[in-house]
């Protein structure tokens, strides 16, 4: 259980230390570290991943006496988090079985997010104010012969995507195929104002049945 903030390096060292002793490391986050609207750099270090639930995190709510699972974590272009929540009351069920829940065979979850019709204005604004994140995205676009300022609303579909790859501390799985299948699915299917989101297993099964040539 981690109740208070700590450095990214210390979290990495502690996690690796436990794993080197043969332990499976599962962090439960105290109130100060609960996910809110945006994902912090430290919170990235507590993320886990499964094919059935995508990115997820465990939170411990001492006041309500529940263990909370936030799963199917995605981010929109404004950086806001979108996810589903499942709660497990204390004393109900076997704790080890609960912690294995994201990896167990189950009906694949899904949810939908309405697309932001003002996103082009937002991105132009971010570039005008030279926000580092969007300046980097613009630089990457230039290298591809693209310009973010010229994009129309449909060009930003899908607006909600999995957590970007980077310095995950608890995830050792190669996520390349997940990111690839995710993007390919929405390119292949008709653009929709209501974007439906699925776990990694869904996209894998989709392309297993519909091989992209």
Where are these regions (language model features)?
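Catalytic cores of nucleic-acid endonucleases
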Residues: 3-59
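Non-catalytic C-terminal interaction segments of nucleic acid-processing enzymes
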Residues: 42-213
């Amino acid at each position: 259980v981690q109740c208070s903030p700590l450095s990214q390096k210390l979290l990495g060292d502690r996690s690796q230390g436990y794993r080197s002793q043969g332990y499976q490391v599962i962090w439960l986050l105290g109130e100060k570290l609960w996910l809110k609207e945006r994902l912090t750099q430290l919170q990235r270090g507590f993320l886990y991943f499964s094919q059935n639930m995508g990115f997820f995190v465990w939170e411990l709510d001492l006041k309500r006496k529940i263990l909370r699972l936030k799963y199917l974590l995605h981010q929109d272009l404004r950086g806001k988090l979108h996810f589903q929540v499942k709660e497990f009351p204390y004393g109900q069920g076997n704790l080890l079985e609960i912690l294995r829940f994201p990896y167990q065979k189950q009906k694949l979850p899904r949810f939908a997010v309405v697309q932001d019709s003002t996103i082009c204005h937002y991105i132009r604004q971010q570039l005008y104010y030279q926000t580092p994140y969007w300046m980097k995205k613009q630089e990457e676009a230039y290298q591809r012969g693209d310009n973010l300022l010229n994009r129309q609303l449909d060009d930003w579909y899908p607006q909600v995507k999995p957590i970007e790859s980077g310095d995950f501390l608890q995830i050792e799985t190669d996520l390349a195929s997940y990111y690839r299948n995710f993007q390919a699915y929405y390119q292949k299917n008709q653009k929709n104002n209501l974007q439906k989101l699925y776990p990694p297993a869904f996209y894998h099964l989709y392309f297993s049945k519909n091989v992209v040539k």
